[in-house]
Amino acid sequence: MTSQITLSLDAMGGDHGPSVVVPAALQALERHPHLHLVLVGQEETLREHLQAGNQGDSGRLSIRHCTQVVAMDEPPSHALRSKKDSSMRVALEMVKTGEADGSVSAGNTGALMATARYLLKTLPGIDRPAIMSTIPTLGGATHMLDLGANVDCTGEHLFQFGVMGAVAAEAVHGLERPRVGLLNIGEEEIKGNEQVKHAAELLLESEEIHYAGYIEGDGIYKGEADVVVCDGFVGNVALKTSEGVATLISEYMRMEFRRNLLSKIAGVVALPVLRALRRRIDPRQYNGASLLGLRGVALKSHGSADSFAFGRAIDTAVREAEQGVPDLINARIERLLGAKEGA
């Protein structure tokens, strides 16, 4: 029997706040009978949204009142100093104290990472936490990190990202010995900067990691690796570029099918295929970036997410909490450190 999982939700964060988080929470409770959710935010506002949604499962849904909200453009340092009663911080504090098994927020990414790192701390042996998300590929999906938390990384940092990504892919997505690839400007050993080359050496030496070598940008979408490792600058640019290209292709297809009567008829005939394609590349399906390397489960939802997308982030947080991903990462790092000391 599955034990109860409690998640704290930053109900005020993101572009839409409670209007997205509350319905997403109610839908998540229907999907997960063992789940208890805590909506963290301004109680009066949250109760209004619950009443509007005809909420009827109060036994597994509760509210934690707080008075402040972190703005989407607020500097992380200001959020840490001046927003100690914010919905984001209180939700993470619940993870720190053990009141919640994980937390989900659609709020300011920089403030979330800074607050999570300050409250939850990094795991022993992990220098920096990283942001990991899932990206659709020809073979299904791949997991990519870092996506913006660390602009400058050493080879050791990239190696740690590979370890964390492999553990999460195994535990949450059921992949056995996931292939870990380093994003690079070429597949040849001589290509890349010193940090990437050093990371490659460390990954090759580790028996804990199934290292797949260097992969180029197009290799991400061909499914050449289950986990793709890069620094946060490269990862964020690659992710945002991919989202832009997907939007461009969708718009081009829409324009072409509306060009004339013949193309409109073709569009009607192709509608089932187009709908299937849209589902496969719909970014909402892959919403929910994991903050790996912390002593607790924390998920970042896209700020503009709708209730369906936010619900996907909740689903990922449930799986990470069920599997105890932070503990699994800690155990893997301990084995690696022990192997280094014994070498």
Curated annotation (Swiss-Prot):
Sections of the chain in a coiled coil: none
Keyword hit for DNA-binding: no
Alphabetized InterPro entries for the sequence: FA_synthesis, Phospholipid_synth_PlsX-like
Any Pfam family the entry gives: FA_synthesis
Reactions performed catalytically: a fatty acyl-[ACP] + phosphate = an acyl phosphate + holo-[ACP]
GO cellular component term, pick one: cytoplasm
Molecular-function GO term, any one: phosphate:acyl-[acyl carrier protein] acyltransferase activity
Location(s) in or outside the cell: Cytoplasm
GO biological processes: fatty acid biosynthetic process; phospholipid biosynthetic process
Annotated EC: 2.3.1.274
Function text: Catalyzes the reversible formation of acyl-phosphate (acyl-PO(4)) from acyl-[acyl-carrier-protein] (acyl-ACP). This enzyme utilizes acyl-ACP as fatty acyl donor, but not acyl-CoA.
HAMAP family noted in UniProt: PlsX
Entry protein name: Phosphate acyltransferase
Lineage: Bacteria, Pseudomonadati, Pseudomonadota, Gammaproteobacteria, Chromatiales
